[in-house]
Amino acid sequence: MIVEPLNLPGVLRITPKIVRDVRGVFIKPFVDVEYREHNLQTNFAEEYYSISFQNVLRGMHFQTPPFECYKLVSCLYGFIRDVLLDIRVGSPRYKMCEIIELDAKDGEILYIPPRYCPWFFGDKQIGNLLL
């Protein structure tokens, strides 16, 4: 697993090990021990899966204390642009956005800490996993 920090503080791009062979592709997106080795939150309380149609903008999901949580976002089919809005009051990037592209073939995962408001846009039919 490769963990790469992005421009937004605390937001990470995780690239899990991907095995490709004649049968297809095998990806293990979450391994508790590996996440802990990188000091990442592993106590996820919910999991969601959505399928969006072409040109749909979805999201602006966030929780306020005491319900705020970390999120894992990955594209399971096609391609998405994930937009993260910084809603951390007092942050130098408060109310600023960053666009991060995710392609299902890469298997990458965004690790999003509390107080970021994610939403995403798919230009094809897509699947999106939130943990």
What are these regions (language model features)?
Residues L102-Q125, L131:
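Conserved metal-binding segment of the jelly-roll/cupin
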